[in-house]
Amino acid sequence: MMLEHILVLSAYLFSIGIYGLITSRNMVRALMCLELILNAVNINFVTFSDFFDSRQLKGNIFSIFVIAIAAAEAAIGSAIVSSIYRNRKSTRINQSTLLNK
């Protein structure tokens, strides 16, 4: 595949993630959009690593670290969302004002 096609795909995924993160009112949907953004960045890391220096695996290794961090972020985020749901009976972002108490 050509470099431009992969970068367009990555930009498309990143744009969908940003749009969903900005317009989302549900915490679970916001977490999913954040994962889309991280995956778009991973695609860029792997693409540029392969395009500029295919003998070294720096971009691929960095992508593995980002995937591991994203998995931890998803686990912690879903635990926080489930805790908020237990207390508030809602996962809507605008109804979660935990700092006001």
Curated annotation (Swiss-Prot):
UniProt protein name: NAD(P)H-quinone oxidoreductase subunit 4L, chloroplastic
Gene3D superfamilies xref list: 1.10.287.3510
HAMAP family attached to this UniProt entry: NDH1_NuoK
Catalytic activity: a plastoquinone + NADH + (n+1) H(+)(in) = a plastoquinol + NAD(+) + n H(+)(out); a plastoquinone + NADPH + (n+1) H(+)(in) = a plastoquinol + NADP(+) + n H(+)(out)
One function term, GO molecular function aspect: oxidoreductase activity, acting on NAD(P)H, quinone or similar compound as acceptor
Single GO biological process annotation from the record: ATP synthesis coupled electron transport
Functional description taken from the UniProt entry: NDH shuttles electrons from NAD(P)H:plastoquinone, via FMN and iron-sulfur (Fe-S) centers, to quinones in the photosynthetic chain and possibly in a chloroplast respiratory chain. The immediate electron acceptor for the enzyme in this species is believed to be plastoquinone. Couples the redox reaction to proton translocation, and thus conserves the redox energy in a proton gradient.
Class of enzymatic activity (EC top level): translocase
Subcellular location: Plastid, Chloroplast thylakoid membrane
InterPro entries: NADH_UbQ_OxRdtase_chain4L/K, NUOK/Mnh_C1-like
Superkingdom of the organism of origin: Eukaryota
GO cellular component: chloroplast thylakoid membrane; NADH dehydrogenase complex
Family: Belongs to the complex I subunit 4L family.
Record's subunit section: NDH is composed of at least 16 different subunits, 5 of which are encoded in the nucleus.
UniProt entry tagged with the keyword Transport: yes
Pfam families the UniProt entry points to: Oxidored_q2
Membrane topology: Multi-pass membrane protein
Gene: ndhE
UniProt-listed Enzyme Commission number(s): 7.1.1.-
Key words, A-Z: Chloroplast, Membrane, NAD, NADP, Plastid, Plastoquinone, Quinone, Thylakoid, Translocase, Transmembrane, Transmembrane helix, Transport
Residues that span the membrane, as ranges: 2-22, 32-52, 61-81
Species in which this protein is naturally found: Gossypium hirsutum (Upland cotton)
